């Protein structure tokens, strides 16, 4: 599962801002729906950019708490993937390298500045903005079908 994937097209002569992030593919208890965030601009997986000296797990725990007011139990590593894209919000080109994990919510409080929604994996893949996040949802589906993790 740790095979490196690269999505998007790196445009020649364009300066990219590199970011390292960690994301969670979170299934509901029935394992038939995935939780994704709806921001003002896009649908995205829970998680985000790491801060200095932060581990993948620490990043996920912090971001899930900030974004949806929940604690997360982090499961298996689904893989690492990168995506080249233009961020209209930040007015810059980005190369985002993400590590993706299965996750399970242990407690959810109020929603913060994002809307957390449950939807079928196919609908999530259709709505997610970034291709490496779409890939991760499919990887999560594959793992859930072949193992008893979570």
Regions found by a protein language model. Name each.
Residues 44, 95, 118-119:
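Short aromatic/basic micro-patch
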